[in-house]
Structures are given as C-alpha cells and as structure tokens.
Amino acid sequence: MMRTLLCATLCALLIAPLFAGLPDPVKSRFVVGDAVWREIPIRDDLQGQYEKCWQTAINAILESNFAVATMDKESGYLRTTENAGVVTLKGDWVYNVQVSIKFTYIPATSGQQASVQKIRIQASGHLAKVSKGRLKEAFQGYDSVVLQNVFQDLQAKLGPR
C-alpha cells in the first residue's frame, strides 16, 4: 500500500512539470507525447463495401468540422487540415488538431471485391506559445476528446453491433 502511494506521488511529481505550462482549457483533453492510433474492426455486413465505408469516414470527418487536406482512396488514407477552432485559447497560445484515418483492407482483384477489415483513427495536436514572433513553449501530443468523439461516431456507423 505504501509502495503504491509512494509510486503514485513520485509519478505525479515527475509529470507535473510537463503540464504546468499548459493553459487550463486544454489540460483535461491534451495528452503530451506520441499521438495514438485507435482501431475499430469493421462489422461483417460492411466488410465487402469499401466504397460505403470510405464515404462514411469522409462524412464523419466533415461533420466534425474538419476539412480534408489529403486523401487517397486507393491506399485508404485520409488526413485533415489542422483545425485551430477546436479550442480557442487566449493570449499567445495556439492549439491545432489534425485527424488522420487509415483503412486496412484487401484490394479488389479479378472476381473479388475489396474487403475492409478495420479503420484506424488518430487525432494529433500541437500546442504552442508564441510571443513577439518567437516560440516560447511547444508541446506535441493528441487531443483525447476529438479522438474519442470521432472514434465513437465511426464505431456507431462502421463497427460491430
């Protein structure tokens, strides 16, 4: 018990400086570190309908107020532009979020249609403080709220029931 408490306290003390500089509006949603990918297996009745899955993913991104920067239907990859309107910060802080989607599928061959296995989602973000044209602080990571919202939307539309 004491060891667990000591470990938790030590971890909190070591991690606290990482988040000390974050503005309050993003502290609960921005995770500093490498952006993570979340996966959704495509439900059985949609696995043979790559076109429908692809269009559903595009619509979900657009409905989440992101604009498409690049997409390649053949490779199953879509990335949005950076969205600075997810959270509006005051002062010298700038916060941008970008969503990426990647389908895992077996392409169509002669006599067989494409088969979609899963969709992967990522919501990377960066947070920067710029003062008088100079970068003062910068953080890389991901937005857990955007990731969860897009994940839940696509899970409901494409995932197992």
Language-model features, listed with the residues they occupy:
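Ser/Thr-rich, low-complexity intrinsically disordered terminal regions
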Residues: 21-161
